[in-house]
Amino acid sequence: RQSKVSEVLSEGNKIRNDCDYYFGSAFYYEKELYWGVDRLNYLEDRLTELGAKKSPSNESLAPLSIKAPEILDSDKLINLTYYPSLNSPYTFISAKRIKQLEKDYPINLITRPVLPMLMRMMAIPTFKAKYIISDAAREGRKYDYEMKEIFSPIGKPARKAYSCLLYTSPSPRDSTL
């Protein structure tokens, strides 16, 4: 029994590695990775576009149902802490949406920039970097923030940009986006 479990795990790990992926709970279809259950809607959309949906219903089986309340009335500001990295494609696709949230809701935006992973000496395998870029691009297309060119401000450019925060922030701990 134990050897069968080990065999199944080894086979799954091999398939995952062959797909150039780095952790479990992902879905893979036709050379496209989906990074967990919050990406199932993309897979369903793709299968529907291909005409593979068996049900005549137009209802989604895996809808992404994240909805903000129509009215959020509060005398108190809600703290939202945002951790952007200058090298992250997720920062590119989220920054404008974060600012819109701040505009539309009683939010006290606290921006806490983080150094890019590469500047923190983190090893990033090529397949992980490729996945992050492709996932962020897919997410960006969904929200009309198409990624065209990629700029990677590692090292001195990042340090200079982050140093400006000392002059633009109301306090050393908080910063504006």
Task: Say what each PLM segment does.
Residues L118-A123:
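A short acidic, helix-capping loop that chelates divalent metal ions and anchors anionic groups
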